Amino acid sequence: MTDLGQAGESLVAAWLEQQGGKILQQRWRSPWGEIDLITHFPDTKIIAFVEVKTRSGGNWDQGGLLAVNARKQEKIWQTANHFLASQPQWSDWNCRFDVMIVFSQGSVPTGENAEGKFANLPTNFQMGQTIVWQGYRLRLEQYLTDAFGG
């Protein structure tokens, strides 16, 4: 995974926590693939398996949406089943499959921001707001709840 992809995932993890989610796993692997984020929402008894797509301008796949095709969905679904089989304490929770699109406006030039790569997140950041995070300018573009079925 690229540094940009990791920055996008960690930004989404922070945003999910601000929304009341608790991150169970990040980059959880199984023989079928990897799930970027596994989050639970205690107030609703929901576990979200979140696929994060971080893209810059001029990409071929509509900001990452086309990359979550039927084959990718099947891999995520199989990996989620493997996770649930290995973690029986979550077996009675409802599950959903979400997708977050993160747009990168490029890296922050050295010296532009004294904190640059290590800038702290605002206490409450919103969708559409550009954030300097881990050396990149990132914007949470779109969060698709229950984007595909299992």
From Swiss-Prot:
Pfam families: UPF0102. CDD domains: PoNe_Nuclease. One of its GO terms (molecular function) is nucleic acid binding. InterPro entries: Restrct_endonuc-II-like, tRNA_endonuc-like_dom_sf, UPF0102_YraN-like. SUPFAM superfamilies: Restriction endonuclease-like. Belongs to the UPF0102 family. PANTHER family: UPF0102 PROTEIN YRAN (PTHR34039:SF1). HAMAP family: UPF0102. This is UPF0102 protein sll0189. It comes from Synechocystis sp. (strain ATCC 27184 / PCC 6803 / Kazusa). The lineage of its organism: Bacteria, Bacillati, Cyanobacteriota, Cyanophyceae, Synechococcales.
